């Protein structure tokens, strides 16, 4: 009798634990963050193509899209463009781009975006006209509030000297942020030196004109928007009733996938103190951006990793980054077919690499694990909604 009673207690405990696990998964806040990096957006594009394919396979649904699985998708510069591509609705209210359409977009339009050189020494390298043209063509008149999931796209206003973050959740307090997506995408991609800043207007709740004078979102987030995306997700968890059970800063209930565009971490192999001592202002301007982006990316990853580990949630955070780019693949604007093919190879090779020196798990395996969580969570939410 005692044995039977103990067995029943054990069964109840298992069922309670299982129920808690399902509830926890159902209420998990899922976040996708995509770095800036110009044409190097092909690297995260390749990673997203793999992830999107896994989700379609797991759910047996060719129409499955990334926006169906993530509560927050954030990006800066080229990552902001990718964010818009996978969250902006088409005429059928589905994302206008599937994951496997991202890389072809770069191959089709990259050579034109990075070919319209102004020919001016004092001025941006490219005029940005083709970039704006293709953004208007693809995104139409769509505004932030129409995004199919929460977005977080950063830019920087050079007139107010403040970062500007475009999110759906900010619109109630700041309706002037409900800008057209093509204006936002151009702004977040308007990297100093490469493209002209972007000026446009919206209107406040009182009907007053609101001006924007924006440049690349990397100025605000220094290339890695993961912390920004995570902060938006944290606010979402606090304000959305669907996540009412999540406690503040409960990273066990956060799932963060952060995609980099690659960097060269071996600066000592590229620059030496003796070499840099001879540089003038222009040479430093070109080098400092690369150094700053790399350093900020490492620091953001270090901070997020530390926080997730401290909360015993390290498996809920995955940073996918290639830290050993060489040659032309380090350039933000080399849109030659040969270099774009190399960037695809970088992404494909990265999938086969281990996530860390301490773990045999590859990025491919880790992404499959994330895809399973995303798929299961979506099914749990769908089942709950059907009751």
UniProtKB/Swiss-Prot annotation:
GO cellular component: vacuole
Keyword Nucleotide-binding annotated: no
Source taxon at top rank: Eukaryota
Chain ranges for the short sequence motif GXSXG as given in the UniProt record: 75-79
GO biological process: defense response; lipid catabolic process
Keywords: Coiled coil, Glycoprotein, Hydrolase, Lipid degradation, Lipid metabolism, Plant defense, Signal, Storage protein, Vacuole
Record EC number: 3.1.1.-
Residues carrying sugar: 115
Coiled-coil region: 322-385
Positions of the catalytic residues: 77, 216
Principal localisation: other
Location of this chain's protein in the cell: Vacuole
SUPFAM superfamilies for the chain: FabD/lysophospholipase-like (SSF52151)
Motif (GXGXXG): 36-41
Tissue-by-tissue expression: Tuber.
Annotated motif DGA/G, positions: 216-218
MF annotations from Gene Ontology: monoacylglycerol lipase activity; nutrient reservoir activity; phospholipase activity
Domain PNPLA: 32-230
InterPro entries tied to this protein: Acyl_Trfase/lysoPLipase (IPR016035), PNPLA_dom (IPR002641)
Family classification: Belongs to the patatin family.
Domain comment, as recorded: The nitrogen atoms of the two glycine residues in the GGXR motif define the oxyanion hole, and stabilize the oxyanion that forms during the nucleophilic attack by the catalytic serine during substrate cleavage.
Role played: Probable lipolytic acyl hydrolase (LAH), an activity which is thought to be involved in the response of tubers to pathogens.
Remarks, miscellaneous: Patatin have a dual role as a somatic storage protein and as an enzyme involved in host resistance.
Protein name: Patatin-12
